[in-house]
């Protein structure tokens, strides 16, 4: 398919969870019904369902597509010779783990071939849990892809991306994210020479905004800052490979048309993007460090009320003003399981070893917290207002244990000396108050 210039002006629709509608040509959207006998433009009506028909209306996600060829027009899928190597779970390992950034490959590698499986909570056929990947790429996709296994949350760390989807175009860059519904066909084009980032595949309930509770009606990620594409299509009869991820395996078929042939659509099962720089950060103006749940951007609810299947949490630039307080994130043992990445700058709990493009994993009850250098500085610091700037760390937090993949445990990026950052914690105890 053609590579679309980054200078092309993209238009978006604003809002979260809306019943959106868009058409690239007049009369693409039928009036008063979803599936007319004869569409005025000769298009096929196709429903794209992200939930069961009988879920509560507030949970229902579906979109009606009006396209040149129905998605059913394809030949038999064949299992691909090239699969994602090393994605099977490695040996059980309760240790705290940290990885250096993965290098951009030298050989031509597109977004799909560049997926690196790091950890997963469960088998893909279970309608819960998450899988975590890194991606590295140096060439645009010349094929289309969709995942039958889950919703994708894409977090760029290096390089801008244009994501061509059935419902339109999304441009994202580092400090922005994109969410792609389960089953949505897309193609990732590079707007720079290379790209690297993180990917969370959500096998459970679709991501949504967290409840605000006593915070009130505003704050955290605001609905109006989420952007959904407008209809865009290509009418092409050039053959194109379509790859799907099904139960963790890659299968492909050959299309005799473009899968990006949706001329109009309406519904709420849609892709979207969000600029993390627009997050309205909440924090203390008195004392102590609040729980990190105040930094939640998106959440997928789990089976236990109040315990998320996945929370997407960020640690953005912010002011630290707490009085008489140890200001870094405190030492912690947690029921939840925490995968962290760093998009930009430095993380305020780790002075060394955690670099942009790197990652860490602290599973259930793994003791963690600020490293020795950070703790010493925080205890001795003069407590005046301080701004943490030029930073963006994030966390995928899940109620299920994340099993590292065999590749994640065997790769050279794994830091074998991670535990050493807590080795020389000073003994400051005294029986007489200071």
Swiss-Prot record:
It comes from the Bacteria. Pathway: Amino-acid degradation; L-phenylalanine degradation; acetoacetate and fumarate from L-phenylalanine: step 4/6. One of its GO terms (molecular function) is iron ion binding. Homogentisate binds at residues 347, 368. Keywords: Dioxygenase, Iron, Metal-binding, Oxidoreductase, Phenylalanine catabolism, Tyrosine catabolism. Fe cation binds at residues 332, 338, 368. Involved in the catabolism of homogentisate (2,5-dihydroxyphenylacetate or 2,5-OH-PhAc), a central intermediate in the degradation of phenylalanine and tyrosine. Catalyzes the oxidative ring cleavage of the aromatic ring of homogentisate to yield maleylacetoacetate. This is Homogentisate 1,2-dioxygenase. It comes from Pseudomonas syringae pv. syringae (strain B728a).
